């Protein structure tokens, strides 16, 4: 089962600073990333491109996904390293209403494939200036794999919809 943990985090403070400094909503995303990269010692990168060739994945449900060109691509907003874990963060205005686990987990799959870093060493998180949510990537993996087994080895509709939107 996936347990989403709502917690306090400096990312919310940095988002508040960005909101105060930038009037244009379209530039706030960039401002949050820039402020965190320059001022947060845990943040190691922003806008990290990730990709994976679906047919070469060792994860069975990813192999079964359909795409226009056999690849999935995306950009991780913020990458952090803290407490011996790699954090994949997504700045989402209105974070409390968002449900980005599919997106974040696909990013984790891509990152794991390209770096060899196991899900057990990754956390997925999304935040805005008021809320910060995180989950263990391994919990998401276990839940997805269990669902995959139960559904007779079919990719969930939600995951397939996400994949089709990103390709």
Task: Enumerate the predicted regions with their spans.
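Surface-exposed cleft-lining segments at the edges of enzyme active sites
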Residues: 12-19, 65, 90-95
């Amino acid at each position: 089962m996936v347990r989403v943990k709502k917690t306090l985090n400096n990312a919310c403070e940095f988002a508040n600073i960005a909101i105060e400094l930038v009037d244009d909503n379209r530039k706030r995303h960039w401002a949050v990333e820039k402020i965190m990269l320059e001022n947060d010692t845990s943040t190691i990168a922003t806008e990290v491109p990730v990709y994976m060739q679906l047919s070469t994945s060792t994860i069975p449900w990813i192999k079964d996904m359909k795409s226009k060109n056999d690849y999935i691509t995306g950009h991780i907003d913020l990458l952090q390293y803290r407490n011996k874990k790699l954090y994949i963060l997504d700045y989402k205005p209105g974070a409390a209403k968002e449900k980005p686990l599919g997106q974040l987990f696909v990013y984790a799959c891509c990152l794991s494939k390209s770096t060899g870093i196991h899900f057990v060493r990754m956390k997925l998180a999304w935040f805005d200036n008021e809320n910060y949510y995180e989950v263990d990537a391994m919990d998401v993996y276990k839940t997805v794999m269990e669902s995959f087994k139960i559904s007779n080895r079919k990719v969930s509709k939600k995951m397939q919809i996400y994949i089709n939107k990103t390709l």
